[in-house]
């Protein structure tokens, strides 16, 4: 387990999932190269639980979209900051970020979290 994680929740058009997976795989490899301890992404498939708030409401998922949840692991917040700085300075990442994205980044939920329980 990690001392610090970044969590991302974002809607992605179903038809763009193959493109999204290729792009995310490249980004994950770049983040790992620059020190990220783990990079994982998940596709939502059980998001309607009775008497609970659906994560679909967080980003107002539209028809034809699916919800992706991602987690990146780091030793600490300062380690995360160092990794992100190196990653974003990488010419390959800069080039990738200049292209079209398979999701609307303005609807992405993002935050950094410290571990409070480890069992």
What residues fall within each predicted segment?
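Long, hydrophobic N-terminal alpha-helical segment
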Residues: 1-25
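Aromatic side chains
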Residues: 4, 8, 20, 39-42, ...
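Short, well-ordered beta-strand segments in beta-rich or mixed alpha/beta enzyme
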Residues: 5-12, 51-87
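Alpha-helical interaction segments
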Residues: 9-10, 29, 100
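Short, well-structured hydrophobic secondary-structure segments
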Residues: 17-19, 29-35
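Residue-level signal for secondary-structure boundary sites
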Residues: 18, 78-80, 118
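Short amphipathic alpha-helices in soluble, non-transmembrane regions
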Residues: 21-27, 83-91
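Glycine-rich beta-strand-turn "strand-cap" elements at beta-sheet edges
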Residues: 32, 36-63, 89-119
């Amino acid at each position: 387990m990690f001392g610090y994680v970044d969590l991302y929740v974002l809607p992605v058009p179903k038809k763009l999932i193959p493109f999204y997976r290729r792009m995310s795989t490249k980004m994950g490899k770049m983040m790992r190269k620059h020190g990220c301890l783990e990079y994982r992404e998940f596709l939502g498939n059980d998001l309607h639980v009775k008497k609970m708030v659906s994560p679909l409401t967080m980003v107002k998922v539209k028809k034809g979209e699916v919800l992706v949840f991602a987690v990146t692991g780091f030793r600490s917040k300062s380690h995360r900051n160092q990794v992100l700085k190196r990653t974003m300075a990488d010419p390959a990442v800069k080039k990738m970020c200049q292209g079209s994205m398979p999701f609307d980044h303005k609807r992405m939920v993002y935050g950094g979290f410290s571990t409070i329980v480890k069992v």
